[in-house]
Design a protein with these regions (language model features):
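Acidic donor-binding loop at a coil-to-helix junction in glycosyltransferase catalytic cores
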Residues: 156-165
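A conserved acidic beta->alpha catalytic loop
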Residues: 32-41, 79-82
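Glycine-rich, basic loop-to-helix element that forms the pyrophosphate-binding segment
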Residues: 54-70
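Non-catalytic, C-terminal membrane-associated alpha-helical segments of glycosyltransferases
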Residues: 195-202, 206-259
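Short aromatic/hydrophobic "clamp" motif used to bind/position activated sugar donors
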Residues: 75
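Conserved donor NDP-sugar-binding/catalytic core segment of glycosyltransferases
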Residues: 87-115
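Short, well-formed alpha-helical segments that are part of the catalytic scaffolds
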Residues: 12-25
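Active-site donor/metal-binding and catalytic loop motifs
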Residues: 176-194, 203-207
Length: 259
């Protein structure tokens, strides 16, 4: 068995079953039932995973609890609605021989024109070599270097952004393998813009808690225009136009929470 625990928070997505089936290595699997539905609970308990339960959804708390009850020295954070491509787990685990953190790539599925635009927009947000999850693997020994905690449970929806800030501040090296990939199902416009709204809420909470790296958005119109020009040149009109609405949703989420 690899010295690795895969931590998967699960709430209401029955695709957890496909996620579990995509695990192609002998590893410890920890499923944290994050205020989960009965259907998701049945899927989890019918597997060979170590099960933890939280009464109400809190992704950061689910990550922390999963890490706490895991028994291996290394953890791999995964989403319940995604699946591993063959070899991904082993690729990320091997990277940990040379560094404390390892990151792979999220591939966003699409079956429609708008789905393709959303997938491209998501790629822009997730292609950087940072400590956002998933797929993110790291050694538990980094704890002391990231201020003594992994994920801030007060920061819903932006807990990995805060984690990345502390990782970067500690000058911890993040190793990256573009071939270590997971597949994310297609997102609808409603789902994606709701996520953007929630990221805005999470960012506002970071500002209210005076977290490093969180800032009050200023010059919103200028920011939208500058982003549009850059993205249009690099990715095309459709993606740039869509991301205007994405940014507006983010700002609305921020405004709702900050007031």
């Amino acid at each position: 068995m690899l010295n690795l625990s895969i931590v998967i928070p699960a709430y209401n997505d029955i695709r957890l079953g496909k996620c579990l089936k995509s695990i192609d290595e002998n590893v410890e699997v920890v499923v944290v039932l994050n205020g989960a539905t009965e259907e998701v609970k049945k899927i989890a308990y019918s597997s060979n995973a170590v099960i933890g339960e939280l009464p109400t959804p809190n992704l950061a708390k689910a990550y922390n609890y999963g890490i706490e009850i895991s028994s291996k020295d290394n953890v791999l954070i995964m989403d319940s609605d995604c699946v591993f491509m063959p070899g991904t787990i082993n690729k990320l685990f091997k990277l940990l021989d040379a560094g404390s953190l390892a990151k792979g790539r999220v591939m966003f599925s699409f079956n429609s024109k708008i789905g393709k635009i959303i997938a491209r927009a998501r790629h822009i947000h997730t292609c950087k070599k940072n400590a956002y999850s998933p797929p993110l693997a790291f050694n538990k020994g980094i704890l002391a270097k990231v201020n003594g905690y992994y994920f801030d449970e007060n920061l819903s929806w932006t807990e990995d952004y805060d984690f990345d800030i502390r990782v970067q501040s500690a000058s911890l090296k993040i190793l990256y393998d573009d071939n270590a990939r997971i597949i994310h199902p297609e997102l609808s416009i409603k789902q994606d813009l709701k996520s953007s709204f929630n990221y805005g809420v999470g960012h506002a909470r970071g500002v209210l808690h005076k977290k490093n790296g969180y800032y009050e958005p200023k010059n919103k119109t200028r920011s939208i225009i500058d982003s549009y020009k850059y993205i249009k040149k690099k990715y095309g009109y459709s993606t740039a136009f869509y991301l205007i609405f994405w940014q507006i949703a983010f700002y609305r989420g921020y405004k709702k929470e900050i007031h």
